[in-house]
Amino acid sequence: MIFINYYDEIKNELINNKITKKIKDYSKNKSDLTTYYNVGKLLKEAGKHYGEGIIKEYSEKLTADLGTKYDASTLNKMKKFYNLIKKMATVSPKLSYSHYVELLPYSDMDKINYYIKITEEDKLSVRELREKIMKIY
């Protein structure tokens, strides 16, 4: 049986993302999307083995090791992001991770795809996307 140290894998993903951001800001969005997808996947797998409480444990360790950016809420969003992306045919590189976070509360893929389309076409900022969603609902 192969044991994976999920915590070290998650920590390495996040450290590598920090390095990538410093080296080349151009690829930041793609790096963020890839990193947060991978972290979400690892969190889901770790949760299967160790229970859902692992997110809280990892958030405490990551906060101590890497800073306050990785609280339980943030890690839960990464896990939800992974679950959302799994359902999608393609991921738009035109949207930032923050755009996708605005769409996480929705389960209707038609609604999500609609907001992705208008965000791409109208080049909406995260704030503009949020306002558009609030106007419709």
Regions found by a protein language model. Name each.
Residues 1-137:
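Basic, low-complexity intrinsically disordered segments
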